[in-house]
């Protein structure tokens, strides 16, 4: 199946052809400089000169469009190192003119004349738009130019850790993209099996939560009791920005295997009372940090309510991506005391059965540990309690540690229920020991929950989840919540 990376390169390949057509249509213009794909120091000078020519905007709109297309073609011909050097050049040499800004700010402070004040204010506003942003905005006029910029930022994000200078370029980039991708510009579309094959292929490539391994599997996710919705931008009409997959069922789902099981018969959507959002995938890496998800879920919930008035409950079946990693750290730091003999016996028997070291962290990494009923009975209660504790833990900014929790709680949902062994696929076991969580979207409460979360850091949760949290806190105060695996005696 097509991967995200191969889809990404396919997009860049098509851009090369499109923009070659742009340059051909206006007579080719200046011949492109011959540059090495890694950008040598001499090549950097050529690119810098070409960027300045783009900014001078000589020859009117047609010439500007041509030069932007040529610059884009040069970028697309670069390898990873060359693209990084290109972006470093943009960040370093095409930032705002600080001296000019200081000068204008001083004039603004000193002027007493209203007309003069407005004139200086406008000049300052113009000066605050960096040359690099004016350069990037030129791509907006090109065919697929917006998609190019989104993918350009995806490249930029991959280099941020290596060069702090690029962070300022990224901040400006976000500001630009936020304006272009305002929610008012976006279109919500219902994707079905009859949608274009190229679009369906992108769903397979971009699915980030539960991998789609075949066309048959995709078809199952688009059956009559399923829905898939995506946001699109008018300048990227064939590219989903974010999409959500929904199951129309009779109750809040507690097991993703059943949701994804293509052998189970479909149900009549008219009889469903519950909509389960079981997968939300951001399709464009270059739009990271621009939040469409909260609008998407609320928009889809409203759309479904109109189509199926019998739907009363809207909830997710969500992953808990870093719970297992957090648990490993906890096991390492907090230590354990022995529990009762039956508990120890179940743990030791499981260690023997799976031929692994007698340590809980090791046992939980065994791919089949969940198939031992004695072991799962022993671990269910303490792991669910610890998972509740994890979901309520906060970072220094008073926001939940878990990214998925931050997203849904920020949208006004509440932590409704934790589900034991809800995802026994390899990824589910690696990320969260198979546990999944339902976030409930009570449409009458979401605004109140959102406000309490944003202003006071309040995490809305059901009584069931609160009880798990209290039990975890009480048990942890008395003694460690998880038993220690003891080595067998000789």
Where are these predicted regions, by residue range?
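Extended, composition-driven regions rather than compact fold-specific motifs
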Residues: 1-290, 294-490
